Amino acid sequence: MADGAGGDAAGRTVTMLGRSGCHLCEEALEVIERVCAELGARVEVRDLDAAPAKERDDYWDKIPVTFVDGAQHDFWRVDEDRLRAALRRAD
């Protein structure tokens, strides 16, 4: 495992699907931004209120939902170590 130096996840993207005013979303985004800054991954935030109806139906009760390179990674909370490991894992 890497020693924490940046660059491990360059080119990877973590997307958070959430809502404005959601305290769990705010907490999750703090973790996502910290891990992505450390590893060199990109952060993308999408607003569930502006998402297509199908996506709102699928994820409404799970926000925040996190995706790594488009694949669902987690929902409700973001575990820092688990996200870090997912970003370091080669696909």
Regions found by a protein language model. Give the residues of each.
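Local sequence-structure signature of Cys/Sec-based thiol-disulfide redox active-site neighborhoods
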Residues: 2-34
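Thiol-based oxidoreductase modules, predominantly thioredoxin-like and allied folds used
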Residues: 41-53
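Short helix-loop-beta junction
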Residues: 35-39
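Short Fe-S-cluster ligation motifs
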Residues: 51-64
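N-terminal, polar/charged subdomain of small-to-medium soluble alpha/beta proteins
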Residues: 50-54, 72-77
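A short, hydrophobic beta-strand/beta-hairpin element that forms part of a small beta-sheet core
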Residues: 63-72
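Short, charged, intrinsically disordered terminal tails
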Residues: 56, 77-79, 85-91
